[in-house]
Design a protein with these regions (language model features):
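Ordered hydrophobic segments in well-structured contexts
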Residues: 11, 28, 35, 75, ...
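Conserved P-loop NTPase motor cores
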Residues: 81-202
Length: 236
């Protein structure tokens, strides 16, 4: 019915007799564009097949994540995927974690979720920057984790090179900030306006492994240093 109505409106407009279309209607061209985008993302792709070959160590992402327990670490590599596929994978993972914390899988055997689940995202400025489109699926999922995840025991841990490029709703909901060495151009942005000039100068001179921690429980920034490995490392 939507398609027929939209087609009729297009025809009337072409004939010069059409009336102004309701803003809630979706044109035929929009439907076709949506279909092309979906088909391009999932058609003839092994990631969307209806079977998982256990002999090749394949598994359903949701089936693996919902069996997470204490001290488990799951690594999902999306670097080689396109942006559309990255959105599918990230959305599926976060939605499974939410359903797990909401008790959607309590009736299944072997389900024993930990009290807290930490979602670590490397290069956060790639997925949740200020330049990311407003309706980006990955950005919406990240914002959902930062704004609602804390009440469910889901914590976002992000790592990025430039804090000033991160979306304001992400940094605004972070309780703890860890600052590593950076340049004076970065510290001159308004994201660092709350830091005293003394700490800004320290950020430009920090050594490798040194960080400044900012948390409401500390009256001032706390400097920490990661210990060196207890074993000798050889560089090629």
């Amino acid at each position: 019915p939507i398609k027929s109505s939209a087609t009729s409106d297009v025809y009337k407009r072409q004939q010069g007799r059409g009336t102004q279309r309701n803003s809630n209607e979706i044109s035929v061209l929009s439907w076709r564009k949506f279909k092309r985008i979906v088909n391009k993302a999932i058609k003839n792709d092994d990631m969307f097949t209806n079977r998982a070959d256990s002999s090749r160590h394949e598994c359903r992402l949701a089936d693996a994540i919902k069996h997470i327990s204490n001290n488990d670490v799951y690594v999902i590599d999306v670097a080689k995927l396109t942006e559309d596929k990255q959105a599918f994978v990230f959305g599926d993972a976060v939605r499974t974690i939410y359903n797990l914390k909401l008790g959607e899988y309590d009736g299944e055997s072997g389900i024993n979720p930990p009290s807290r689940i930490i979602v670590f995202i490397d290069e956060l400025n790639k997925y949740a920057s200020k330049d990311t489109p407003k309706y980006s699926p990955i950005l919406q999922e990240i914002l959902d984790v930062t704004e609602r995840g804390r009440s469910l025991g889901v914590v976002l841990f992000g790592a990025e090179q430039f804090r000033s490029n991160i979306h304001q709703r992400v940094t605004g909901n972070c309780s703890t900030h860890a600052y590593g060495r950076t340049n004076s151009i970065e510290t001159s942005t308004k994201d660092y306006s709350s830091l005293p000039s003394t700490y800004k100068n320290m950020l430009t001179r920090l050594e490798q492994g040194d960080y400044l921690i900012q948390n409401p429980i500390f009256r001032s920034l706390l400097k920490i240093r990661f210990p060196k490995p207890i074993y000798k490392q050889f560089k090629k």
